[in-house]
Every structure is written in C-alpha cells, then in structure tokens.
C-alpha cells in the first residue's frame, strides 16, 4: 500500500507533466506545519529545460468524514480550493503581488482538491512579524 506522500507525489507528477512537459520530476515533497483548514506542501518541480521551480501545494486535508467535490471542500470562509486559487489568479491580473498559480488538482482517489502555486521566501509566523526587530519596517 502506498503512503499518503507517495500517492500525492504520483498525482502531482502527472499534473506537473501535463503542465510543464514530459520529463518533469517532483522532488523534495514535504508537508509544512500550520494550516488549520487546509494542508500546505512544499516541493520543487525539476522541469525538462533543466530548471527548478520552487512550488507550494495548498489542498484540503484528507478526511473520512467529509466528501469533497472536484473543486474542494469549502472552508469556514465558504471558499473551496479552486475558488481560492482562482481569486489569487484574478488578483495577480490586476496588479496585486501574489504567488503565481501554476495548476489545479481535482480530487481523486489519491488526493483531495488543491492548487499549485509559486513558492516565495519569507516569514509566515505572525508573532515574529509583530515582535521581531527584523520586521519593524513592515509594521505600521
């Protein structure tokens, strides 16, 4: 029986080949901590031209109690993963600085619905941003 990571890697690999081309490989897949209403996974796509794309997968958490549709489970805010990813795309189209959404994953037996976007470096912990001197310029 395949692990959750193996199943997810398989689904990501197929979608990445469809999006980036034959020869694309998924490397360094790791689940990140945090995320109360969805999972966040970090990985790189090694693409056929020799480049590497740092990426993030945001997906619904697996659950035996919840049946999600192809676009995902609505969160407490009422937004499924497809809508969340699409909102990021639309925000980017009007000049809001957001990560680029590369592709969407539909729910299937290997994974829940989600989307893959550009991975950006930076701090994500609010406590650090609010208290550490290194982020003083970012605070009002």
Ranges and model annotations:
Residues 1-25, 29:
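Juxta-kinase regulatory segment immediately upstream of eukaryotic protein kinase catalytic domains
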Residues 30-140:
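ATP-binding pocket architecture of kinase catalytic cores
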């Amino acid at each position: 029986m395949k692990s959750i990571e193996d199943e997810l890697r398989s689904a990501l690999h197929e979608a990445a080949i469809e999006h980036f081309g034959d020869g694309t490989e998924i490397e360094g897949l790791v689940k990140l901590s945090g995320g109360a209403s969805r999972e966040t996974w970090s990985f790189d796509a090694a693409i056929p031209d020799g480049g590497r794309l740092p990426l993030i997968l945001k997906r619904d958490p697996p659950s035996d109690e919840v049946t999600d549709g192809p676009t995902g489970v609505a969160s407490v805010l009422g937004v499924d993963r497809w809508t969340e990813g699409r909102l990021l795309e639309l925000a980017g189209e009007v000049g809001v600085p957001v990560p680029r959404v590369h592709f969407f994953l539909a729910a299937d037996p290997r994974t829940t619905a989600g989307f893959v976007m550009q991975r950006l470096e930076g701090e994500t912990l609010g406590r650090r941003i609010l208290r550490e001197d290194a982020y003083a310029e970012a605070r009002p």
